[in-house]
């Protein structure tokens, strides 16, 4: 029996999303509401990818070595990729335990934060308004994140990820290597690991470049803190019943001392 009507209504990726949302060993009810969420996710992934690639992110922008990590001169970009490195570790661990529903949940949560917060914060830099170095930094962050997200989402949304992959990468996303976040190593250990695994992927250590690994947790927190401030500004505009694009003359942000 083939559910043609459901597939035509929501798409194959959306139906697969619903199936993947079920916990291993648990009974799962037929739920078109979950399919609607899956369809929305697939469409958003498609549109967000178009936007990122139209900004100028290319395959060459993807960070695959420690040396390339030095292009990341903006703390917000470094924060995003530090969080990405930990997402890869967490999603991989979930898959290894056959907890694919959890892997989907954490990837989806990261993706919505990426599109709703990070992408909204970097548009001026992406268009070159703050100079070439800032533009190169943000394009590297965008390309590296998109590259990893397509690989992570491929088991759940195989058709839309394959379509997006074909826009800027050769071959098939389903034959591409699984993204890997390197262990946080220091000095010669990191150099040795990098030499043996030249295409292993982005790591939190690479994002920090020459910084102390102890700073990683603080670095990870930058993006959510900025996103929280952005959310406060959005709420203030909504409460004032003005358009979101209305300029803010001034804002006071209270935060604990670093």
Language-model segments: residues:
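Acidic, turn-prone loop/beta-hairpin segments
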Residues: 59-66, 70-89, 120-232, 240, ...
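Short helix-adjacent coil turns
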Residues: 95-102
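Aromatic-lined ligand-binding clefts that engage carbohydrates, nucleic acids, or primary amines
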Residues: 104, 108
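Membrane-interfacial loop-to-helix junctions in multi-pass inner-membrane proteins
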Residues: 30-37, 99, 134-142
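Conserved structural-core and active-site-/substrate-pathway-adjacent residues in large, well-folded domains
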Residues: 11, 45, 114-115, 158, ...
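Catalytic adenosine-cofactor/nucleotide-binding cores of aminoacyl-tRNA synthetases and other
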Residues: 1-65, 173, 239-245
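Generic alpha-helical secondary structure signal
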Residues: 13-17, 79-86, 109, 113
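Glycine-rich, acidic and aromatic/proline-enriched surface loops and short helix-turn segments
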Residues: 51, 112-120
């Amino acid at each position: 029996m083939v559910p043609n009507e459901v597939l035509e209504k929501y798409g194959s990726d959306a139906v697969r999303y619903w199936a993947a949302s079920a916990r291993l060993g648990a009974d799962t009810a037929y739920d078109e509401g979950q399919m609607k969420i899956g369809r929305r996710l697939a469409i958003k992934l498609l549109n967000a990818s178009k936007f990122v690639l139209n900004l100028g992110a290319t395959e060459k922008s993807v960070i695959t070595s420690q040396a390339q990590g030095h292009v990341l001169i903006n703390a917000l970009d470094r924060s995003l990729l530090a969080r990405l490195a930990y997402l890869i570790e967490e999603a991989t661990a979930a898959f290894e335990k056959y907890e694919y529903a959890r892997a989907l949940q954490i990837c989806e949560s990261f993706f919505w934060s990426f599109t709703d917060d990070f992408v909204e914060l970097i548009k001026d830099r992406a268009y070159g308004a703050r100079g070439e170095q800032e533009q190169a930094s943000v394009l590297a962050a965008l390309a590296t994140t998109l590259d990893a997200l397509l690989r992570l989402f491929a088991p759940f949304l195989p058709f839309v990820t394959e379509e997006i992959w074909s826009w800027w990468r050769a071959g098939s996303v389903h034959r591409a290597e699984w993204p890997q976040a390197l262990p946080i190593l220091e000095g010669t250990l990191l150099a040795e690991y990098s030499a043996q695994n030249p295409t292993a992927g982005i790591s939190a250590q690479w994002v920090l470049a020459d910084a102390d690994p102890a700073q990683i947790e603080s670095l990870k927190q930058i993006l959510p803190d900025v996103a929280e401030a952005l959310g406060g500004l959005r709420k203030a505009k909504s409460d004032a019943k003005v358009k979101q694009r209305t300029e803010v003359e001034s804002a006071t942000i209270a935060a604990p001392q670093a």
